[in-house]
Amino acid sequence: MMKSGADLQFPPGFRFHPTDEELVLMYLCRKCASQPIPAPIITELDLYRYDPWDLPDMALYGEKEWYFFSPRDRKYPNGSRPNRAAGTGYWKATGADKPIGRPKPVGIKKALVFYSGKPPNGEKTNWIMHEYRLADVDRSVRKKNSLRLDDWVLCRIYNKKGVIEKRRSDIEDGLKPVTDTCPPESVARLISGSEQAVSPEFTCSNGRLSNALDFPFNYVDAIADNEIVSRLLGGNQMWSTTLDPLVVRQGTF
């Protein structure tokens, strides 16, 4: 059972500021594979049922930005366009999609802005969403009359005004940004579009999962479960299974 935000306990100095690659590989891939994730602090929620300003109270963790695992539905039964209606408004894509992973993309990052009201006359707000979805996924209609497009996408929600102020503060303080970690060359193909939490066609052996996650933690080592890491990685010597419980990287925005 998922803990409530009040039940979660973190060591002093803990910050959750993962890179795009870490979000896709360590969280989204594992979620779609029904594998344990490093930190159970991302809420499972159909965020398209709510206005963005209601979401922070539903998140397990976050101060200026909040993370959610959410399903994604089709706009039309036989189409591939996602339904972006949400709460009393809608999300509208902005800018170009960003591939995550090289040389072969593992995921896709899309930026969206929330508009209050009905399209095309909605009022633009300061609420931003970064939506991460898996690349190389079969999103064809797999069940008659099913509107499910993705079982899970990972979403980061924040208010643009707060983010701008935080970034300016970091620059003035001379803080260095977190360096992105290079992802693997490939990841197992995932099949989505079912009504289940994990598509039945999806399989992921320990070897494939180890290759997909073959890089060290850079922000949440201290709370990784040693037994789970050892079992998942199958003896991969790159990751130490003896973690210092007090070592937590101080995150930056």
From Swiss-Prot:
Free-text comment about domains: The NAC domain includes a DNA binding domain and a dimerization domain.
Gene induction: By abscisic acid (ABA). Induced by salinity and osmotic stress, and during leaf senescence.
Function summary: Transcriptional activator that positively regulates age-dependent senescence, dark-induced leaf senescence and stress-induced senescence. Regulates leaf senescence through the modulation of the expression of senescence-associated genes SGR1/NYE1, SAG113 and SAUR36/SAG201, which are involved in chlorophyll degradation, and abscisic acid (ABA) and auxin promotion of senescence, respectively. Promotes reactive oxygen species (ROS) production during age-dependent and stress-induced senescence. Positively regulates auxin-mediated responses in roots.
Gene Ontology terms describing biological process: embryo development ending in seed dormancy; positive regulation of DNA-templated transcription; positive regulation of leaf senescence; regulation of root hair elongation
GO molecular function: DNA-binding transcription activator activity; DNA-binding transcription factor activity; transcription cis-regulatory region binding
Gene Ontology CC: one annotated term: nucleus
Domain of life: Eukaryota
UniProt organism field: Arabidopsis thaliana
Protein name: NAC transcription factor 32
Residues passing through the membrane, by range: none
Main location: nucleus
